[in-house]
Amino acid sequence: MSHFFLDVNRFLEAGQNVVIARIIFQTGSAPRSTGTGCIILEDGTIIGTVGGGALEYEVQQKALSVFKKKSSQLVNFQLTGKEVAQTDMLCGGIVDVFLEPITATNIATKEIFARVKTALDNNDKATLVTRVAEGIGHDQSTARMLVVDDGASV
């Protein structure tokens, strides 16, 4: 099984844009926990999961919109009420998902994910910090930062 960020780097190296969908808040019964994420490609292909079923379908549809708008989106999902009862979902919680466009044309972003790959390949300790906000453009170089164990940052 490949590492999530290695997959992102691989797609960027191939010139493919992706949307990272990550659960940033979860309360009650939900299919996955905070921090869980998946990668959505422009054709709708999903690598990984944020929970499957109706939730994953909605995340996929929102991601396709993020590709068009080229800016981040915060989405709140209420896994409660009649709508959920009419599906096969067994959960009854609340989930917030951050959808982040990652484009292969953003040189700073490509450098960060290449450095993440290097850190993983070398078993270096590193922390990837992502700014979470609605409307962050795909070309903003301040959307994320990588801090490696030696104190250097990218």
Regions found by a protein language model. Give the residues of each.
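Segments forming oxygen-rich coordination pockets for charged ligands
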Residues: 1-154
